[in-house]
Amino acid sequence: VNEGVPFVHRAVDEDDKTADIIVKVIDNAVSALLKYRNDAASHAFERAITALAEAGKSGKRIEFYGVGNSGIVAADAQHKFFRLGVHAAAIVDSHVQVMSATMLEPGDCAVIISNSGRSRDLLDVAEIARRKGATSIVITTSGSPLAQMGQGGATQVLLAVDHPEDYDRYSPMVSRLLHLMVIDILTTAVALRLPGELRPMLQEIKKNLRAKRYARPE
């Protein structure tokens, strides 16, 4: 598990056949996931998980901010976290982001997701969250302006996600998968730290959802 995994990003070419595209896209994703498994900073995850779990236990707000592709990840995060019985929201409109961040308080968590780490809207959110005393959990590439705002303070956590990707030729794919994986890690770990009555609630949700589906054929 701890062995190094060589990362080889194979760019998709215009003359690639369909079979080549399938192999390259899947290989790039698998390679990036394995590399991140070995590179992920467990101490940063521990800080983020602790802050999120404490916010969930105390009824504080957990808000996910993203724009564009990262807004889709934010929506996925909200979908996962609200099922844990916590106050979770995904905010993707830049004006609403400013308003919501302004209402943050100490103990609240603002999870800011960005592929480039250079979105002006999200940099504004990070600055407002810092001023309001909320915990900022930043999921972005290291060395970016947003990453710098996720470091250096007791209420600032950086979950760095680095990956080579050709943004000019196609929409970022590997980055989205890595961000979704980070959300899955956070959700799983936070669920294990929430009170014991969570499990019956999750079972009831599954039971009620089954009523929304057609029965399987005999």
Regions found by a protein language model. Give the residues of each.
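Generic structural signal for well-ordered, non-membrane alpha-helical segments
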Residues: 15-22, 26-29, 45, 70, ...
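Glycine-rich phosphate-binding loops that contact phosphosugars or nucleotide phosphates
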Residues: 53-181, 187-194
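Context-gated lysine
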Residues: 17, 24, 35, 57-60, ...
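HTH-adjacent hinge/linker in prokaryotic transcriptional regulators
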Residues: 1-43, 47
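Short charge-dense sequence patches
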Residues: 1-5, 22-30, 72-77, 127-138, ...
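Internal, active-site/partner-interface "lid" segment
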Residues: 192-218
